[in-house]
Amino acid sequence: MSRVLVIESSARQRGSVSRLLTAEFISHWKIAHPADRFQVRDLAREPLPHLDELLLGAWTTPCDGHSAAERRALERSNRLTEELRMADVLVLAAPMYNFAIPSSLKSWFDHVLRAGLTFRYAEQGPEGLLQGKRAFVLTARGGIYAGGGLDHQEPYLRQVLGFVGIHDVTFIHAEGMNMGPEFREKGLARARERMRQALETDTSLCVPLPTLR
């Protein structure tokens, strides 16, 4: 049995393509892994504060000197960090906002990139402490950006996940979502085919998956 942590970061509850992909991913994953446990953290329903003086202070001062607000900030960060550390599989649903990730997802990373917990400073430089985990990134993009100079989303996510030791990362892009019905249909079809390929090449699958649609 594996633990699967899903992070939803779309600001929209309705009409969100990244949420659509997440729902399909979870549905088909459960068919193949019925015993796995899912935890979904929705950053739109439960927004996190941006990195601020309270959290920075809590990280850098002794516990007995924390104010009540600093304790709450640290407890939140600890809870989020432990969720990530306990997960075997991470699923990030990340629409592209202004060529990058939603600020809510950046805030989540700011809470869980913790020296001594998710990475450490070693003699040879920073070392990720979350080796052995897998990640799937489900993105929705209004235009077509993969492999181009305006795609600051995938390079950043690969770097930040690799920084904490997560190198087995699969990206599933739904592109052209705002370019008209034809582009949208083709973009969703490509994303679903990529998802099907990613799930079918999972060596732990014990049953064939139905067609993604």
UniProtKB/Swiss-Prot annotation:
Pfam (any one): Flavodoxin_2
E.C. designation(s): 1.6.5.-, 1.7.1.17
Q: Which reaction does it catalyse?
A: 2 a quinone + NADH + H(+) = 2 a 1,4-benzosemiquinone + NAD(+); N,N-dimethyl-1,4-phenylenediamine + anthranilate + 2 NAD(+) = 2-(4-dimethylaminophenyl)diazenylbenzoate + 2 NADH + 2 H(+)
Q: What are the recorded GO MF terms, alphabetically?
A: electron transfer activity; FMN binding; oxidoreductase activity, acting on NAD(P)H as acceptor; oxidoreductase activity, acting on NAD(P)H, quinone or similar compound as acceptor
Its required cofactor(s), as named, are: FMN
How is the cofactor bound, as the UniProt entry phrases it?
Binds 1 FMN per subunit.
Q: Which residues bind FMN?
A: 10, 16-18, 96-99
Which keywords label this protein?
Answer: Flavoprotein, FMN, NAD, Oxidoreductase
Signal sequence annotation = none
Recorded superkingdom? Bacteria
- What does the miscellaneous comment read? Rate of quinone reduction is higher than reduction of azo substrates, suggesting the enzyme is better suited for carrying out quinone rather than azo reduction.
Report the function annotation for this chain.
Answer: Quinone reductase that provides resistance to thiol-specific stress caused by electrophilic quinones. Shows a preference for naphthoquinones such as plumbagin.
Subunit structure, interactors included: Homodimer.
Which family is this sequence assigned to?
A: Belongs to the azoreductase type 1 family.
Q: What is this protein called?
A: FMN-dependent NADH:quinone oxidoreductase 3
Gene that this sequence comes from: azoR3
